[in-house]
Design a protein with these regions (language model features):
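Active-site pocket-lining/capping segments in soluble small-molecule metabolic enzymes
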Residues: 125, 138-170, 175-184, 222, ...
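Catalytic cores of alpha/beta
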Residues: 101-114, 190-194, 219-222, 242-248, ...
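Glycine-rich, proline-tolerant flexible connector loops at the mouths of alpha/beta enzymes
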Residues: 41-74, 125-139, 203-220, 302-304
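Conserved N-terminal beta1-alpha1 strand-loop-helix module at the mouth
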Residues: 1-48
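Conserved, mostly hydrophobic/aromatic
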Residues: 18, 46, 112, 198, ...
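Flexible, glycine-rich active-site loops centered on histidine and acidic residues
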Residues: 102-149
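Active-site mouth loops of central-metabolism enzymes
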Residues: 14-32, 90-103, 172-190, 266-280
Length: 316
């Protein structure tokens, strides 16, 4: 079932979450161990992230260094198939621009179609850690809107090779939205312009980056509606779990903590106290969002479901 069908057919706020593929060498059981505690809340879909290659330098026998590309968290498509088989819940793989040619993207989408996976979250993706800015594949897409256009074209039966009659795909496309704007955008108006381009290209729903101030989400939704973005906008929440999150989350994701949350976090002396504040704040956020009848609340678990379970018990 498509994500948009889940959203349109429910009168109540839905529950969904995102997981990471395990580090290479770990078993699929580590994924199931993270999902099992959350199944009692009846998630309608589960997102699985995709991670770009990284580069390391390995010394060769002659003493020279060789640059090698590695993927630390492979398995996105296989995990999606395993989730759908084991839990009978729809899985949403992330599909990114970085590192893929258009043909590789087309082939990946064909694989997904053959597996019965008909939802994708289309993202540009981050730059490689060793690069200061995002660099697309020379034969790939530079922006998420271009990736969405390609998926939409395939939904219309238009493939890269267009001299034969080809079967249309049937993907439901999700896109990312940023209540505090994407850090590369000049301002919020520009960011919303690009978001509308993604919706016009075929995105049927939006999932937001994490935020900790619900007012910013509400203002973001209002701003979207004012410029004609009328698709469902799913709020994304991330429970704060440890002391490092106090500095890491604002720095990496370019987001702010509201004053009330900051004051509580600064009182904490250890990770246990931080996690409890994160749970309490997550419950408060979730209850307010649910009271406003948002279509779904999407939780970023980072494959650690403890805090999300504690929040969901009080909300769903």
């Amino acid at each position: 079932m498509k994500v948009i069908e889940h959203l349109n057919s429910s009168e109540n706020t839905l529950f969904s979450f995102e997981i990471l593929p395990p580090l290479k060498g770990k078993s699929i059981q580590s994924i199931f161990d993270g999902i099992d505690p959350l199944m009692e809340f009846k998630p309608k879909f589960i997102n699985v992230t995709y991670h770009r290659e990284e580069y390391i330098y390995k010394e060769r026998d002659n003493g020279l260094l060789e640059k090698i590309a590695i993927r630390k968290r492979p398995g996105t498509v296989g995990i999606c198939a395993a989730i759908m088989n084991k839990y009978e819940v729809d899985a949403v793989p992330h599909l990114i621009c970085g590192g893929f040619s258009k043909e590789e993207t087309e082939n990946a989408l064909i694989d997904l179609q053959f597996l019965g996976i008909d939802n994708v979250l289309a993202l540009r993706g981050d730059s490689i850690k060793t690069e200061s800015a995002f660099r697309p594949h020379k034969d790939g897409h530079a922006y998420a809107v271009d990736l969405i256009n390609q998926i939409s074209e395939m939904n219309g039966g238009n493939y890269i090779v267009d001299d034969v009659q080809l079967e249309p795909t049937n993907f439901c496309i999700g896109a990312a939205g940023y209540p505090e704007k994407h850090f590369e955008s000049m301002n919020m108006s520009t960011d919303l312009h690009y978001l509308k381009m993604k919706v016009d290209a075929g995105a049927e729903y939006i999932v937001t980056q994490m935020f900790f101030d619900n007012q910013k989400y509400f203002e973001f939704v209002d701003a979207c509606r004012e410029i004609g973005i009328n698709v469902p906008i799913i709020p994304g929440l991330k429970p704060i779990k440890n002391l490092s999150h106090i500095t890491f989350l604002p720095k990496f994701f370019k987001i702010d903590f509201p004053d009330a949350l900051s004051k509580e976090l600064l009182k904490c002396k250890d990770n246990k106290a931080i996690e409890q504040v994160g749970i309490e704040w997550g419950i408060q956020q979730s209850k307010e969002l649910k009271a406003k009848n948002v279509p779904c609340i999407h939780y970023y678990t980072m494959s650690n479901s403890t805090s999300v379970k504690a929040i969901a018990k009080e909300v769903f």
